[in-house]
A protein has these predicted regions:
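Short acidic-glycine motifs
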Residues: 1-355
Length: 355
């Protein structure tokens, strides 16, 4: 946990502006000392995850087995963020149905799964296997840590393009001099999450075939993963105007990116990052592997994997602002379309030799 822009963030239009100290934009995050009582304040909260798993194996015949199990995970958040009553009241009037002191649901996350293994000729030469189930990984509570820092109570964020009176201060601990020149008392960047928010869960199906042909052991496998719950962010402080950049600027008539307007004008809420769930997204993996073992001690193997992974938000940052700002979309940042995952590696080819 940290105070974003604590040491000041300066933006410049050109390298020459940087050289001349001509600031285009300035951002500064600071703890409101009269609230937490510490200029280096950081929130404290407790979280945990309880998991239970039961599994059984049934030998239906000599060459056909079923394995089935049930996992239950319970996410626990032992604290709540601080209530920002003015914002909570304002959010209610906007119909956002969010508040800064929202608690996390501790409803159990059930993950049943079943798998099979069929030794077709009962000689281990041709084996068909597969399964289907729901899966929940380790819960990334860092996504919720933003809500404890971004209540709008303990921190203020200065974000201005009115920089004529500001100086380029190289001392990271001397940024207060610029903050004191700003007329505003500091806008608030808030982080909230939907009261129905649940952590990520995936439906996964796999089918594999192990066989031996010409003395070579082969494995062909396919895995399909469908998103049931994943994350996506909205900036509630901005909404589309209904126009594109090309409509606003005729010289850019080819540009169909939507224009946005701030809907919190007159309020100190510059950015309101809200965390929601989505069921959009999937991953397909197809692989083929060959292995050859020689009696004189040489082992050879080669494999190829093709992957297609689609998502609407990679969740690659610990900061809500970054997860929203740097999520690629050509349409609407608050309603992103399905696109290639940042973690997608379409083609993987491996080869190995051991002696």
């Amino acid at each position: 946990l940290f105070i974003q822009d604590k040491y000041g963030s300066y933006f410049f239009n050109t390298p020459n502006d940087l050289y001349n100290g001509k600031i285009y934009r300035y951002r500064y995050g600071v703890a409101n000392v009269d609230v937490p009582g510490d200029p280096n304040w950081a929130p404290r909260f407790g979280a945990g995850q309880v998991g239970f798993y039961a599994q059984d194996k049934w030998d239906v015949t000599d060459n056909f087995q079923l394995t089935y199990g049930l996992r239950m995970d319970i996410p626990l958040l032992f604290d709540k963020p601080v209530a920002n009553k003015p914002f909570n009241d304002y959010a209610r009037t906007k119909g956002w149905d969010v508040r800064t002191d929202q608690g996390l649901s501790s409803a159990p996350m059930w993950s049943p799964r079943v798998g099979f293994r069929w030794d077709i000729n009962n000689d281990r030469r041709f084996i068909l296997r597969g399964g289907v189930g729901l899966f929940t990984g380790r819960i990334p509570f860092v996504w919720l840590s933003n809500n404890f820092t971004g209540t709008g109570i303990q921190l203020s964020t200065y974000d201005t393009r009115s920089t004529s009176k500001l100086n380029l201060i190289y001392d990271p601990n001397g940024q207060k001099a610029n903050a004191e020149k700003l007329k505003a008392s500091g806008n608030q960047t808030l982080n909230v999450f939907d009261k129905k928010f649940r952590f990520s869960q995936t439906l996964r199906l796999n089918l594999g075939f192990d066989f031996n042909v010409l003395g070579i052991n082969w494995t062909a496998e396919g895995i399909f993963s469908k998103t049931l719950n994943d994350i996506y962010y909205k900036n509630l402080a901005y909404e589309p105007t209904g126009q594109t950049l090309g409509q606003v600027d005729p010289s850019l008539s080819f540009d169909n990116r939507p224009m946005f307007k701030r809907v919190t004008t007159g309020q100190p809420y510059s950015y309101v990052y809200a965390l929601y769930n989505t069921n959009k997204g999937y991953t397909i993996n197809l692989s083929l592997k060959a292995e050859k073992h020689f009696d004189f001690g040489l082992d050879l193997s080669a494999s190829y994997t093709w992957t297609k992974s689609m998502t609407i938000n990679n969740g690659s940052s610990s900061v809500a602002q970054s997860n929203w700002n740097y999520n690629y979309t050509y349409r609407n940042s608050n309603d992103p379309e399905l696109g290639n995952s940042a973690f997608n590696i379409p083609h993987i080819l491996k080869a190995a030799a051991f002696y």
